[in-house]
């Protein structure tokens, strides 16, 4: 959805479910 997941990401990897890496942070889909 674009809400911040509370996680930064490196190499495009997010560990929070249903989140994707965007501009070095994880956003909910």
UniProtKB/Swiss-Prot annotation:
Family according to the record: Belongs to the cyclotide family. Moebius subfamily.
An individual GO BP term: defense response
Pfam families: Cyclotide
Domain notes: The presence of a 'disulfide through disulfide knot' structurally defines this protein as a knottin.
Protein name: Cyclotide cter-N
Disulfide bonds: 5-19, 9-21, 14-26
Modifications the protein undergoes after translation, according to the UniProt entry: This is a cyclic peptide.
Chloroplast keyword on record: no
Function, in words: Probably participates in a plant defense mechanism.
Native species: Clitoria ternatea (Butterfly pea)
Cross-linked sites for Cyclopeptide (Gly-Asn): 1-29
GO CC annotation terms, alphabetical: extracellular region
Cellular compartment(s): Secreted
Keywords (A to Z) from UniProt: Disulfide bond, Knottin, Oxidation, Plant defense, Secreted
């Amino acid at each position: 959805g674009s809400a911040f997941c509370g996680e930064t990401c490196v190499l495009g990897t997010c560990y929070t479910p249903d989140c994707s890496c965007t501009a070095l942070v994880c956003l909910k889909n």
